């Protein structure tokens, strides 16, 4: 992750992707704690931090005018992207809250973290070629290839 943040031509986002339970969320939360610590020590000219939002909660946040500010958060993390419904109905209108949020953040070049269990093919299939193509420009992808750290999984 340090390499992704210090590239000569940095992208304005990081995607942590891989199977369940291999440390994506743990790394994101550790980075959030590090920024909070450094912020408290005065290492930044402006207050900075990461707001973490579960992908399933984005549709509710984007409908509420008071919480629409989530889209302008300087550093936003979308946790577990891919678990949410791609489209939602709002008074008869079909909305794509995560896609709309990602397109907005792409256009404004706002730093976005994403954790997901989806691979590149799954992202293209769920969100379409347009978002997948924008991710190529926007995100430094860090694959997590380890198996689950949570122990034995249930065989179902």
Regions found by a protein language model. Name each.
Residues 33-36:
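Walker A/P-loop NTP-binding motif
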């Amino acid at each position: 992750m340090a390499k992704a943040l210090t590239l000569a031509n940095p992208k304005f986002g990081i995607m942590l992707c891989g199977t369940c339970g291999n440390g994506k969320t743990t790394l994101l939360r550790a980075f959030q704690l590090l920024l909070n610590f450094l912020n408290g020590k005065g290492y930044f000219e402006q207050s900075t931090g990461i707001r973490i939002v579960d992908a399933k909660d984005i549709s509710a946040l984007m409908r509420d005018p008071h919480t629409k500010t989530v889209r302008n958060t300087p550093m936003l993390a979308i946790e577990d992207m891919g678990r949410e419904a791609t489209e939602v109905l709002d008074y008869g209108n079909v909305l794509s809250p995560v896609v709309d949020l990602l397109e907005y953040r792409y256009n404004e070049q706002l730093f976005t973290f994403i954790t997901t269990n989806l691979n590149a093919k799954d992202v293209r299939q769920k969100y379409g070629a347009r978002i997948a193509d924008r991710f190529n420009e926007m995100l430094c992808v860090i694959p997590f290839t380890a198996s689950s750290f949570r122990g034995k999984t249930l065989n179902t």
